[in-house]
Swiss-Prot record:
Principal subcellular localization: membrane
Record's compositionally biased regions (Polar residues): 106-126, 184-196, 203-215, 243-261, 313-324
PTM notes: N- and O-linked glycosylated. Sialoglycoprotein.
Signal peptide region: 1-19
Tissues of expression: Expressed in thrombocytes, kidney podocytes, vascular endothelia and mono- and multipotent progenitors from the bone marrow (at protein level).
Subcellular location: Apical cell membrane; Cell projection, Microvillus; Membrane raft; Cell projection, Lamellipodium
InterPro entries tied to this protein: CD34/Podocalyxin (IPR013836), PODXL (IPR017403)
GO cellular component terms attached to this protein's record: apical plasma membrane; cytoplasm; filopodium; lamellipodium; membrane raft; microvillus membrane; plasma membrane; ruffle
Descriptive protein name: Podocalyxin
A family per Pfam: CD34_antigen
Regions that span the bilayer: 477-497
UniProt keyword Acetylation present: no
Glycosylation sites: N187, N214, N296, N406, N457
Naturally occurring in which organism (per UniProt): Gallus gallus
């Protein structure tokens, strides 16, 4: 009851004592609870800060210890303990190497974590062992005040850490849990929850930080690697414990309060293996915790834990996931497999559909049908034929008159059958790939067949089939008709010219005869004169001949006829 009343006066007293102590010291706190409890030794070395320790009074069943460091104001409260407690304030140093060793007088060895942190970091560790659990809470802050109180009848250990904008609740399983939570200063946050391993194996945690500071606006990066190793220890008992950490802007009425409203704390998941022999796996956790100032901290943590899916202890149930990865916006994302990578990962047995299958020679024992027979000079077996089947061999058997065999495009199968090795029956099957342009031309000529199949049009390279295909027989018919017509016209022209010429000749001959008759003047009728001309000429000739013979011989009949004709003419 006296401890709460002395709290306002003790910070002033301890402030003077701590300001005078500037030498490098080592702070050691030894808490010895009852005979049924364990002895915890904590060694902490800090840099550029001054610390104050507030140790609460342990109860008969569960003690509670809270420790915090500040730069400006420090407070320390010491309460009554059952056995003894020794406290000392460490001075600044260049590195921090805290180690926590917990031993049990009852022959039970708990987990022994070893932590190493960088400068400008305040670490507060509370070690406690109630036969089954070990809770360690670390809080970093630029200005903190610590007040601790303990009740005499609290059955479990409860530690509350107040930061800003984050609330996290972790329920460990069997053996121990270490919770490190950052606040305003650029520090790292690590959570490791090792559970009870089979046959008393423990987990040892080692952290190797590295911080690079480049001024007020530089980036603070922290890379830590957590490795888990197995150490044989005695078995542990199962007991339910709960550690809750909540955020508040002003105060916390449990044990520890820290007011940093502008410093968000990242949330992450921890992995806890279930009891039993399970193989260990590796997982990576990357966190980014920005502070209220211009500094940022990036934490990369590699945790090696055992595979566990679900763990339930007592009243509280906790689901643990192994291999959980949390990434900050600044961390690089993991590469995801793409469709291209999936296509590259296919087996090389799969052949491309555009590649033609190889040519082959198939031998048969019996001749199924009438085939050409090859007579050989020497006997050959099927293996001899296959050895001789090169490109020239297939060009000889697979080439035709109209189409030459192309080994890169076409496929040829030669089947040989024989009962006698000197006589082979050959059967050739050629799978020929047609040229697309030739196929288009062939389809253009088969419009009617395509319409029967329901095909209306065929296009190739922006070319379409013609709407109407002309009849090939119509052109020769037209040519024949035109030729016959021309021939008839030519014959008609020739006939007309010849007929006109003959008619002109006849007319000229008649005119000539009439002119000759008129000149003679014998008769009025030119027709008669023409007819008489011949007889007269004959008579004259006769007369001439008669004159030569000195005789005039004139037949009487001729004279009588001439007289009659003259009479008729005159009439």
């Amino acid at each position: 009851m006296r401890a709460p009343l002395l709290l306002p006066l003790l910070p002033l007293l301890l402030f003077g004592v701590s300001s005078g102590n500037n030498d490098k010291t080592t702070h050691s706190t030894t808490v010895s609870p009852e005979t049924t409890k364990q002895i915890t030794t904590i060694t902490v070395t800090t840099s550029q800060v001054q610390g104050s320790i507030s140790a609460s009074k342990p109860s008969s069943t569960a003690p509670t210890a809270v420790m915090s460091f500040t730069k400006a104001q420090e407070a320390a409260t010491s309460s009554k303990q059952h056995d003894s407690s020794t406290s000392s304030i460490p001075p600044p140093s260049t590195s921090i190497t805290p180690s926590i060793i917990t031993t049990s007088p009852q022959g039970k060895t708990p987990s022994t974590p070893a932590l190493t942190h960088t400068p400008d970091q305040n670490t507060k560790t509370t070690g406690r062992q109630d036969d089954t659990s070990h809770v360690s809470v670390a809080s970093t802050s630029a200005s903190q005040q610590v007040s601790s109180s303990a009740s005499a009848a609290v059955p479990t250990t409860t530690s509350a850490v107040t930061s800003s904008a984050t609330q996290q609740k972790v329920s460990p399983t069997d053996s121990s849990e270490i919770l490190l939570k950052p606040s305003a200063s650029p520090n790292s946050t690590q959570v490791t929850s090792p559970s009870r391993t089979p046959k008393g194996f423990l987990s040892t945690v080692t952290t190797s930080p590295h911080i690079a500071d480049n001024g007020s606006t530089a980036l603070n990066q922290l890379k830590s690697t957590v490795s888990s190793s197995e150490v044989p220890v005695s078995s542990f008992l199962d007991k339910d414990h709960s550690v809750s950490s909540s955020t508040s802007a002003t105060n916390q009425h449990l044990s520890l309060s820290s007011h940093r409203p502008t410093s968000p704390v990242p949330k992450f998941e921890c992995s806890t293996p279930h009891s039993g022999s399970v193989p260990s796996t590796s997982s990576k956790t990357s966190l980014s915790s920005p502070s209220s100032s211009t500094k940022n901290a990036t934490v990369t943590t590699t945790m090696t834990t055992a595979k566990a899916a679900y763990t339930s202890q007592g009243d509280g149930s906790v689901t643990h996931k192994s291999g959980v990865t949390a990434q900050s916006p600044t961390s690089a994302p993991l590469p995801t497999p793409t469709l291209k990578d999936h296509m590259k990962s296919k087996s090389p047995d799969q052949t491309h559909s555009n590649v033609s299958p190889p040519n082959e020679v198939i031998c048969e024992d019996q001749i199924g049908e009438v085939r050409p027979i090859l007579n050989l000079k020497e006997e050959k077996t099927c293996d001899d034929w296959k050895k001789a089947s090169n490109e020239a061999f297939f060009e000889v058997f697979c080439s035709g008159r109209r189409h030459a065999f192309n080994s890169t495009r076409d496929r040829c199968t030669v089947k040989l059958a024989s009962s006698n090795h000197r006589r082979w029956a050959v059967h050739v099957i050629v799978h020929r790939v047609l040229d697309p342009a030739a196929v288009f031309e062939e389809l253009k000529e088969k419009r009617n067949e395509l319409e029967k199949l329901g095909i209306t049009n065929v296009t190739y390279l922006n070319q379409e089939m013609e709407e109407e295909i002309k009849d090939q027989s119509s052109t020769p018919l037209i040519i024949t008709i035109v030729t016959l017509a021309g021939s008839l016209l030519l014959i008609a022209a020739i006939y007309g010219c010849c007929h006109q010429r003959f008619s002109q000749k006849k007319s000229q001959q008649r005119l000539t005869e009439e002119l000759q008759t008129m000149e003679n003047g014998y008769h009025d009728n030119p027709t008669l004169e023409v007819m008489e001309t011949g007889s007269e000429m004959q008579e004259k000739k006769v007369n001439l001949n008669g004159e030569l013979g000195d005789s005039w011989i004139v037949p009487l009949d001729t004279i009588m006829k001439e007289d009659l004709e003259e009479e008729d003419t005159h009439l």
